[in-house]
Amino acid sequence: MYRTHNCGELRKKDVEKEVILSGWVDRIRDLGGIKFIILRDRYGKTQLVVNPNSPAYEISQELGREWVIQVYGKVLERPDETKTEMVTGEIEVEVNKIKVLSKSDVPPFYPGENVSEDLRLKYRYIDLRDERMQKNLIIRHKMAQAAREFLNKHDFLEVETPYLTKSTPEGARDFLVPSRLQKGKFYALPQSPQLFKQILMVSGFDRYYQFARCFRDEDLRADRQPEFTQIDIEMSFVKMDEILDLMESFARFVFGKVGIKLPEKFDRLSYEEAMELYGSDKPDRRYGMQLQDFTNYFVNTEFKVIKNVLERSGSVKGFITTIPISRKIASQFEEFVKQYGLGGLLWFKLDDEIVSPTAKFLKESYKKIVKEYNLDKGSVVLLAAHENREILNTALGALRLKVGKEYFNELEKVFDALWIVDFPFLEWNEEESRFEARHHPFTMPKNLEQKLEDIKAYAYDMILNGMEIGGGSIRIHDSEVQKRVFEIIGLTEEEANEKFGFFISALKYGVPPHGGIAFGFDRMVSIAANVASIRDVIAFPKTSSGICQLTGAPSTVEEKQLKELSIQIFKGGIENERNES
């Protein structure tokens, strides 16, 4: 037996027990010849005491940090003045025997030290000993267990779908896997199980879920990885409202299992409302500061900057806040919004009178805003003008978020969840001069008889604290509608059959109305763990350039392997060398 208890288990009730503990040496102190050792495992830490007269004293002199040891001893109550806030802080173990299970070289850093992320990822086995990282993975486990518990209780079946499948690009690049047996042909790793889960609905499995590994060869950010985990869910014979209601309950249950209370009812905003009020389709509403349309207060202005915009049917929008403002801060904000296409930023604050660098030109307009919105002393209004409403909303939305994060960080612990619905069905691709599906081409449109740019989709995103944690839609279950959608996005019948023939065929054999959602599990855990990057909730993540620092992947392979796959490496890329024989 290596241990009778773990390092986070012993309490005052265990005093006088003979115990065996195993773990890592976290700290060693020598006080007056007495050795104090903190022993650590994933459950916690326990203080060990080795007296000079102990049979274990000699070996305790040799120990180093991060060595793995086994100790035998008796549980004692600590003197009151030495008790700590540790969960085991009321006791210590007086050691009479130490066995070294494994020595450790001096590590490049110790668990919990502040070092670069590259170093943490290279020596991930050291980094994962940090109690913060272990806490994150424990949260991940609890949320995964909760998700399965909820879905199993609601009659969902967990079904696995293939990793090696057909390349059907969904926006990002596919990761391709060459076939050895089918020379010159490639599998693709799935960007999502989208078509397989819809085929499961056609097959009669009316409630499906899967913890799906998904792969996308795209540029990475703090919340992106080339491989990531989705909780993939699909249902048959359901309306959109039924999906949204059940998935709200799902989210409340999963987050509730890790101590996070979500709202009893999630608000629903249309895409257009979200953009108008928050300048984002992923609004973080915790900060308030909704965007306001101030255009009417400036219709008679002679101030050239605004007058020119209004003559081109533009708008004036902004938001009201209470932050301290100065010319220096306003100048920083102005440079920020210029990155989003605005020419500048206007502002005023209400002290005993209106204070603004543009007050002599716009004071009457500012007075109207003060009166209409009943502004109090200390109020600050940030506003801008532009002829393109989308640019205006997006820029002010980004500024609103910047102000919220910098000045109202006490709201970070609040949780706000909502649905965004009524997304545009299509978006215009400038480079290819055509419409393409905003979500994917299997989303059900609301009305195909409208102008293409006005068509809305039965699509929905779940937003938590300004992050999209889930997205889905009602799917097309009519082969004629699916054919029409392919035509609208510029796919010929031949191209559609080449890419999706197997799926188009399935639509001919009795398809139930169905819809679903996919939750970004890594992102959900990162919110619950309150970390900035999903790399901190994944055991072995890639860097922002897609490299595994631990293993060195991706790496070169032997020439023999390439020949078996009929692949030749050449400067600038990979060439498929077809073997005619």
Swiss-Prot record:
<dbReference type="InterPro" id="IPR004524">
    <property type="entry name" value="Asp-tRNA-ligase_1"/>
</dbReference>
<dbReference type="InterPro" id="IPR004364">
    <property type="entry name" value="Aa-tRNA-synt_II"/>
</dbReference>
<protein>
    <recommendedName>
        <fullName>Aspartate--tRNA ligase</fullName>
        <ecNumber>6.1.1.12</ecNumber>
    </recommendedName>
</protein>
<feature type="binding site">
    <location>
        <position position="225"/>
    </location>
    <ligand>
        <name>ATP</name>
    </ligand>
</feature>
<dbReference type="Pfam" id="PF00152">
    <property type="entry name" value="tRNA-synt_2"/>
</dbReference>
<dbReference type="Pfam" id="PF01336">
    <property type="entry name" value="tRNA_anti-codon"/>
</dbReference>
<dbReference type="GO" id="GO:0003676">
    <property type="term" value="F:nucleic acid binding"/>
</dbReference>
<feature type="region of interest" description="Aspartate">
    <location>
        <begin position="194"/>
        <end position="197"/>
    </location>
</feature>
<dbReference type="InterPro" id="IPR045864">
    <property type="entry name" value="aa-tRNA-synth_II/BPL/LPL"/>
</dbReference>
<feature type="binding site">
    <location>
        <position position="216"/>
    </location>
    <ligand>
        <name>L-aspartate</name>
    </ligand>
</feature>
<keyword id="KW-0547">Nucleotide-binding</keyword>
<dbReference type="GO" id="GO:0006422">
    <property type="term" value="P:aspartyl-tRNA aminoacylation"/>
</dbReference>
<feature type="binding site">
    <location>
        <position position="468"/>
    </location>
    <ligand>
        <name>ATP</name>
    </ligand>
</feature>
<comment type="function">
    <text>Catalyzes the attachment of L-aspartate to tRNA(Asp) in a two-step reaction: L-aspartate is first activated by ATP to form Asp-AMP and then transferred to the acceptor end of tRNA(Asp).</text>
</comment>
<dbReference type="Pfam" id="PF02938">
    <property type="entry name" value="GAD"/>
</dbReference>
<feature type="binding site">
    <location>
        <position position="475"/>
    </location>
    <ligand>
        <name>L-aspartate</name>
    </ligand>
</feature>
<dbReference type="GO" id="GO:0005524">
    <property type="term" value="F:ATP binding"/>
</dbReference>
<dbReference type="InterPro" id="IPR047090">
    <property type="entry name" value="AspRS_core"/>
</dbReference>
<dbReference type="InterPro" id="IPR012340">
    <property type="entry name" value="NA-bd_OB-fold"/>
</dbReference>
<keyword id="KW-0067">ATP-binding</keyword>
<dbReference type="InterPro" id="IPR047089">
    <property type="entry name" value="Asp-tRNA-ligase_1_N"/>
</dbReference>
<dbReference type="InterPro" id="IPR004115">
    <property type="entry name" value="GAD-like_sf"/>
</dbReference>
<feature type="binding site">
    <location>
        <position position="439"/>
    </location>
    <ligand>
        <name>L-aspartate</name>
    </ligand>
</feature>
<keyword id="KW-0648">Protein biosynthesis</keyword>
<dbReference type="GO" id="GO:0004815">
    <property type="term" value="F:aspartate-tRNA ligase activity"/>
</dbReference>
<comment type="subunit">
    <text>Homodimer.</text>
</comment>
<keyword id="KW-0030">Aminoacyl-tRNA synthetase</keyword>
<feature type="binding site">
    <location>
        <begin position="216"/>
        <end position="218"/>
    </location>
    <ligand>
        <name>ATP</name>
    </ligand>
</feature>
<keyword id="KW-0963">Cytoplasm</keyword>
<dbReference type="GO" id="GO:0005737">
    <property type="term" value="C:cytoplasm"/>
</dbReference>
<dbReference type="InterPro" id="IPR002312">
    <property type="entry name" value="Asp/Asn-tRNA-synth_IIb"/>
</dbReference>
<comment type="similarity">
    <text>Belongs to the class-II aminoacyl-tRNA synthetase family. Type 1 subfamily.</text>
</comment>
<dbReference type="InterPro" id="IPR029351">
    <property type="entry name" value="GAD_dom"/>
</dbReference>
<dbReference type="InterPro" id="IPR004365">
    <property type="entry name" value="NA-bd_OB_tRNA"/>
</dbReference>
<keyword id="KW-0436">Ligase</keyword>
<feature type="binding site">
    <location>
        <begin position="520"/>
        <end position="523"/>
    </location>
    <ligand>
        <name>ATP</name>
    </ligand>
</feature>
<feature type="binding site">
    <location>
        <position position="170"/>
    </location>
    <ligand>
        <name>L-aspartate</name>
    </ligand>
</feature>
<dbReference type="InterPro" id="IPR006195">
    <property type="entry name" value="aa-tRNA-synth_II"/>
</dbReference>
